[in-house]
């Protein structure tokens, strides 16, 4: 693979053609060379003609496939031993801007946003690099999805310093980055200011994507007045709303249970002569089902069957799970039969919905039958399917059966993941199964599952809910008395709350799990501890190799404060 990517034979004439701008419509000289035996003379056929659009599309798709192959090769070589920049230097003659874009996507999916910045710094050192809004927009989007709003703001200022003038796509990425923060009220105020700022810049006029992002965000927060104001602003602007605009707002309203507001948006959609698509029908069916307005849900499904659109698997999955929550087992089974009659192949999500549906209805044996049918089939059983069956057992009070299934998961060729451990930990703790909690912690350590911050916070929440007098009306008094009465020192606050031996015993298991977690973190950064002390690296914490160590140190301090 390495030879093919770097050898001269990989530099084909098609790659040269694909690099020509799409707008040109020139006639190119095409060669067709037939290579025969070494003794025979080489025959060359020269033809002139316009390259068809179909051939251009095929060459473009071929180039994209080659780019993804190279990016996958680069991603497979990323490790702690070999830095990413060193790997990029090996392919410096091949890697270009398109490959870096794909690298940003792959690194962002795997939570390696720091390495995105390393790739960006490496790009800036190359001769072919030209500051471009697309690069900054992509990086800002990746940083926003990972909650790194400050880094997104730094990239925005860096873009302006490099000579690039921001456009609507950059502001859209910046708005999305702010909306990923935890303080939604402050974020909404901030993005509203960005919208006003965009209106004052000629080349940054808000487009339909801008309004789609803002409308969905305000609808999710339940701010109906702001949504109506944005729709009014949209009607006065030259931008026309599309089906994605209405679908996003209706989905946000529907998930918040705001049915009247959702129907008002549907009326506005019809008045704008915007035809609903399958996403529109799925949003309506799911929203009505969650509010248990099944008459409207069934009417919407009938309208879908009469329309040109065809139902999808999410359509049936939503109806099955919502009927199950209402304990309407006959109608849920009718939907599953209807799906099979229409020659739809159930996915693993469909089977999980059926398992959960029977669990809601109390038919544990039928849920177990479906689980075993999926396990015995050729399908690869997923951890989410195992989690669904475990939840059915725990929901119906069968904790022993859930524990047996968990320990016999290997018989079904499925391995529990971190979500499995988190769910069982909460279930065992609420059921006061202290012995199972200890066994679960040991197996968690044995399987190499490292708990994160959310796991510890939820563990403390479960412990707090099991304390006597831990209702919502007594929480404030508990917090105030905790600071006065509890002794100082690490762990002193928690040990005074759990006076009985059983709670101390279970809480000690959580502390042991936290200790192992910190030991894993300390072993991770032990090899690069000396490098992190260099003064030269302290001056550049943004792209230095010790940035990861700084994050790990912050996590250690956070867990120490939490527990």
Swiss-Prot record:
One GO MF term: mRNA binding
Nucleus keyword on record: no
GO CC terms: chloroplast
Location of the region described as Disordered in the Swiss-Prot/TrEMBL record: 468-501, 520-551
Subcellular compartments: Plastid, Chloroplast
Transit peptide: 1-47
UniProt-listed Pfam families: PPR, PPR_2
Keywords: Chloroplast, Plastid, Repeat, Transit peptide
Phosphoprotein as UniProt keyword: no
Any Gene Ontology biological process: embryo development ending in seed dormancy
Ranges of Basic and acidic residues composition bias in the record: 520-537
Major subcellular location class: plastid
Function recorded in the entry: Essential for embryo development.
Protein name: Pentatricopeptide repeat-containing protein At4g39620, chloroplastic
Organism: Arabidopsis thaliana (Mouse-ear cress)
Lineage per the UniProt record: Eukaryota, Viridiplantae, Streptophyta, Embryophyta, Tracheophyta
């Amino acid at each position: 693979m390495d030879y093919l990517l770097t050898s001269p034979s990989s530099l084909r004439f098609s790659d040269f053609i694909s690099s020509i701008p799409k707008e040109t419509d020139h006639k190119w000289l095409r060669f067709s060379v037939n290579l025969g035996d070494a003794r025979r003379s080489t025959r060359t056929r020269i033809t002139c003609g316009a390259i068809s659009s179909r051939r251009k599309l095929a060459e473009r798709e071929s180039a994209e496939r080659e780019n993804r192959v190279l990016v996958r090769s680069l991603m497979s070589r990323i490790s702690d031993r070999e830095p990413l920049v060193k790997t990029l230097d090996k392919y410096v003659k091949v890697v270009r801007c398109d490959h870096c874009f794909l690298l940003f996507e792959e690194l962002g999916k795997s939570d390696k946003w720091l390495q995105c910045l390393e790739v960006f710094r490496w790009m800036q050192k190359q001769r072919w690099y030209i500051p471009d809004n697309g690069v900054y927009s992509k990086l800002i989007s990746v940083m926003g999805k990972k909650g790194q709003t400050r880094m997104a703001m730094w990239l925005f200022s860096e873009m302006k310093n490099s000579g690039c003038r921001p456009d609507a796509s950059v502001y859209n990425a910046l708005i999305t980055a702010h909306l990923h923060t935890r303080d939604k009220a402050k974020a909404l105020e901030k993005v509203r200011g960005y919208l006003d700022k965009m209106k004052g810049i000629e080349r940054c006029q808000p487009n339909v994507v801008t309004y789609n992002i803002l409308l969905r965000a305000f609808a999710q927060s339940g701010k109906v007045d702001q949504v109506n104001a944005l729709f009014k602003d949209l009607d006065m602007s030259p931008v026309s709303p599309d089906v994605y605009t209405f679908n996003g707002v209706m989905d946000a309203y529907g998930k918040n249970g705001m049915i009247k507001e959702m129907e008002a948006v549907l009326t506005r959609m019809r008045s704008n002569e915007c035809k609903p698509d399958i996403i529109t029908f799925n949003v309506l069916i799911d929203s009505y089902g969650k509010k248990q307005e099944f008459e409207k849900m069934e009417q919407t499904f009938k309208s879908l069957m009469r329309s040109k659109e065809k139902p999808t698997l999410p359509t049936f999955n939503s109806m099955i799970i919502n009927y199950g929550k209402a304990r309407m087992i006959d109608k849920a089974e009718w939907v599953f039969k209807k799906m099979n009659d229409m020659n739809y192949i159930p996915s693993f999500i469909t089977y999980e919905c059926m398992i959960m549906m029977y669990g809601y209805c109390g038919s544990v044996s039928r849920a177990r039958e479906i689980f075993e049918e999926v396990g015995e089939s050729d399908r690869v059983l997923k951890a989410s399917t195992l989690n669904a069956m475990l939840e059915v057992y725990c929901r119906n009070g069968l904790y022993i059966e859930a524990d047996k299934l968990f320990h016999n998961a290997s018989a079904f060729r499925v391995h529990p993941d971190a979500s499995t451990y988190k769910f069982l930990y909460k279930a065992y703790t609420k059921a006061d199964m202290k012995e199972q909690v200890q066994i679960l912690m040991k197996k968690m350590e044995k399987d190499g599952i490292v708990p994160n911050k959310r796991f510890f916070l939820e563990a403390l929440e479960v412990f707090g809910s099991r304390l006597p007098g831990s209702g919502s009306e007594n929480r404030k008094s508990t917090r105030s008395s905790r600071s006065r009465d509890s002794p100082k020192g690490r762990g002193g606050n928690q040990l005074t709350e759990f006076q009985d031996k059983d709670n101390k015993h279970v809480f000690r298991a959580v502390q042991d799990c936290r200790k192992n977690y910190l030991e894993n973190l300390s072993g991770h950064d032990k090899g690069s501890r000396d490098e992190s002390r260099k003064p030269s690296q302290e001056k550049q914490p943004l792209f230095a190799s010790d940035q990861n160590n700084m994050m790990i140190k912050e996590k250690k301090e956070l867990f120490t404060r939490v527990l």
